[in-house]
Amino acid sequence: MDTRKLVSLRIQQLCATHGYNINSLARQAGVPPTTLKNIIYGNSHNPGIVTIKLLCGGLGISLYDFFDTTQFKSTDPEDII
């Protein structure tokens, strides 16, 4: 699975865990809702680390926590590029 899809799925998982929908997470993180929707729906070809960091702040987690999953650890480095 490519990294963009993994990021999208991870955000959706964390939203469900923390009780957020797209708009509420965007508001909490200070990110435009369209930016978050573009990441989730696969329209963003390169979700930036700064945006992911803002989302983590809105969720109250660290970047480490965001990426500390089996799926990210087993991602083929070729898929990241």
Go through the PLM ranges and name each one:
Residues 38, 67-81:
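Short, charged recognition helix plus adjacent turn
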Residues 30-46:
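Recognition helix of helix-turn-helix/homeodomain-like DNA-binding domains
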Residues 43-57:
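Short, basic-rich loop-to-helix N-cap that marks the start of a DNA-contacting helix
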Residues 25-26:
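Short alpha-helical "recognition helix" segments of helix-turn-helix
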Residues 1-21:
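A short, Lys/Arg-rich alpha-helix, primarily the initiator
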Residues 16, 41, 71:
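Residue-level detection of the helix-turn-helix DNA-binding "recognition helix"
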